[in-house]
Amino acid sequence: MFLMNILCLIIPILLAMAFLTLVERKILGYMQLRKGPNVVGPYGLLQPIADAIKLFIKEPLRPLTSSKTMFILAPTLAFSLALSMWIPMPMPHPLVNLNLGVLFILALSSLAVYSILWSGWASNSKYALIGALRAVAQTISYEVTLAIILLSIMMLNGSFTLSTLTTTQEHLWLIFPLWPLAMMWFISTLAETNRAPFDLTEGESELVSGFNVEYAAGPFALFFMAEYTNIIMMNALTTILFLGALHNPLFPELFTVNFVTKTLLLTVTFLWVRASYPRFRYDQLMHLLWKSFLPLTLALCMLHVSTPTMLAGIPPHM
């Protein structure tokens, strides 16, 4: 039965991830006044299936000097972690209702750094290694602000369980009182998932394709799938944290529809940002975090710790 639950969680995620690639290409196409994929199937709807078949039947070549075990292990780890992060997500019922769901997601997103580092190191290519080092520095840096923002929200929530956030936001979405944090959170999620304008790891002019430059066929597809699964996961988390979906215990379907709609809108915003903004310079990326976001999030975190205490509005279970 539990295996069935896991399959019911993973299959919709994989389908959503497959069609997100199509949605991205369509949106970018229409924003550049062209059609996007429209040959495979009606309106190009079968394009993701064609892409998957093409990638998985190709021969998985690897460089002669690469480290074989790590080269295969890195993409597998990346994709496994991307799927594991969905375990504590309330939609409206999580697969496993963890007490420290937020901490679990943070820990797994930190582990994803290893898959990037290993892939760059195992490829034995200078481009892949430089791309991996950039990606690791960027991911670790932006995780600092993500953790502090999450801490502020958990102070207001009174618990590290994601499910209680729906109760917290019954009367007011947290995006209204916490809009500065929401803005910084959204920008940090863009950087965390290596998306434009923060896709420094894939600087075509200097690094070809970044840490996955030596990958082809199946292993490359796993990295690709991990990236898009992470994008949907981050937007789902943003929805839970800031745009608390309507939860009526009598009609749990309403929660799911509400949740999916908000996540979809946020994902389209991700793609819109990609179509609109040029890439940052690497020093600007780091300055934005360490000189702007970190002091601001720390100040706001102190505010959110002190205000409830000052007004004696401490959550009862703390």
From Swiss-Prot:
Which UniProt key words apply to this protein? Answer: Electron transport, Membrane, Mitochondrion, Mitochondrion inner membrane, NAD, Respiratory chain, Translocase, Transmembrane, Transmembrane helix, Transport, Ubiquinone
* Superkingdom of the organism of origin: Eukaryota
A GO CC annotation recorded here is: mitochondrial inner membrane
Family that this chain belongs to: Belongs to the complex I subunit 1 family.
Briefly state the protein's biological role: Core subunit of the mitochondrial membrane respiratory chain NADH dehydrogenase (Complex I) that is believed to belong to the minimal assembly required for catalysis. Complex I functions in the transfer of electrons from NADH to the respiratory chain. The immediate electron acceptor for the enzyme is believed to be ubiquinone.
- Localization of this protein: Mitochondrion inner membrane
List GO BP terms, alphabetically. aerobic respiration
Give the main EC class: translocase
Q: Which reaction does it catalyse?
A: a ubiquinone + NADH + 5 H(+)(in) = a ubiquinol + NAD(+) + 4 H(+)(out)
Look up and give the organism this protein is from.
Answer: Priodontes maximus (Giant armadillo)
Could you tell me which InterPro entries the record lists for this protein?
NADH_UbQ_OxRdtase_su1/FPO, NADH_UbQ_OxRdtase_su1_CS
User: What is the name of the protein in this document?
Assistant: NADH-ubiquinone oxidoreductase chain 1
Its Enzyme Commission number(s) read 7.1.1.2
How is the protein disposed in the membrane? Answer: Multi-pass membrane protein
Q: Which residues cross the membrane?
A: 2-22, 70-90, 100-120, 136-156, 171-191, 231-251, 253-273, 294-314
GO molecular function list: NADH dehydrogenase (ubiquinone) activity
